[in-house]
């Protein structure tokens, strides 16, 4: 039996893609082993959203080549899709494939293994408006409790800092039938929570309108919830302007749809939002957040913020700090701006010094910690349903509640992958303490 090892960098969508490829290889008779163990094939699923992601992708590729000179090295994902010539130039890479036609990954790998080609087997495909969603199955052979199901691919937003539309192509969506089928497989495999994810999740179904199919993210969520036995459904990141009122109503009424929305802000300064080509200003974002909280009062709203975007002054950053406080985010993911070749922002004047970016990120992180503690404090005294995932020690278990907060309770590993009501009794560092109710 041939062995294959995977290494995944980047986002949840990449993780879902890797899980799908693992499933394809297992179905073809391969054994999946940890990346540090001997294998016939090493596959690196890459990331280019930041310079750090791209640099680490190169490091992992080089490590795979250096440590396993007789094995096949396969590179897939956003790096070969956006810079195939760079990946081709890495000595020792045998196969490259972008973000499309990964259903053929075993065929390509076996062709390379059979013939031990002296040149790279290159299958990076250009994506056009006619590119269809690649309905790969989901990998189900893990010991995890939550599964990520990719239901949407591609982005047409073209924010000025972002390379992802070039890496992931145009909008395309998984069919409702496929969503029901894949959620059914996950439920049968024992997963208690399914997280619906995409590159531009709020645009689910948008491109299908030209085929006469009028579906939205609301319909995708309803499809997932319609599967017998599904216990929890959670949404991945989506734009605030794409949150439908009926989706909020569903979240308020349907206990299985978790009370958590990740709404990327990126900046709290209107001047910077315009320069970023974001689809809202701070006034509209505030209105949307208020509407969400009016319909779902106990919702947790998390976000992404970029600091040090070209032209961001100290005054602009101070505006973002104050706006973040006003929004009361449960958690912020903070990113120093990373210049990406080929994007408009990379050519903008007034690039911000790296030291200034780091200093601003640290200041915003302090605000994030304050807001997170406020969110934790507001949960004390409540009863939450917790999906237990792993043991902290021999006497305590850790899990995730609806608002995407970590909860630790006295308990043993028998609680793993079960859902139980927990009375929240206190806070320790950045997580909640509780007792089984």
Model-inferred region functions:
Residues 48-49, 168, 208-212, 274-280, ...:
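Short glycine-enriched, charge-decorated loop/helix-capping segments at active-site entrances
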Residues 103, 157, 169, 202, ...:
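Glycine-centered loop/turn positions within well-structured domains
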